UniProtKB/Swiss-Prot annotation:
Species annotation: Influenza A virus (strain A/Turkey/Bethlehem-Glilit/1492-B/1982 H1N1)
Cellular compartment(s): Virion; Host nucleus
Gene Ontology, cellular component aspect: host cell nucleus; virion component
Gene designation per UniProt: NS
Note: Average number present in a viral particle is estimated to be 130-200 molecules.
Motif (Nuclear export signal): 12-21, 85-94
Role: Mediates the nuclear export of encapsidated genomic RNAs (ribonucleoproteins, RNPs). Acts as an adapter between viral RNPs complexes and the nuclear export machinery of the cell. Possesses no intrinsic RNA-binding activity, but includes a C-terminal M1-binding domain. This domain is believed to allow recognition of RNPs bound to the protein M1.
Name of the protein in its database record: Nuclear export protein
Amino acid sequence: MDSNTITSFQDILQRMSKMQLESSSADLNGMITQFERLKIYRDSLGESVMRMGDLHSLQNRNATWRDELSQKFEEIRWLIAECRNILTRTENSFEQITFLQALQLLLEVESEIRTFSFQLI
């Protein structure tokens, strides 16, 4: 994983953890948790691609990896929708910057996961 992406994930997660949005903190904590899981999934998928011979063990270990992949794309779409929703509601510039960066990061990660998955298929 690119060091800028790691820094971006860490920066966004840190800033989100300091926020108090009008929506419940449970919603924000859920977003943070999903961001963290998405990062871990992306890292593990990237590592599998790096070890291209790992494709068969990945398929043997988890016959439903395509379903998992589909679920991750659904999570990304949900996170993108949530970021957009927050952006339309908030007037706080700190929140706007944070969620614009989160949105950009999600789009980058979605693209990377697509690239990794095509290499594994």
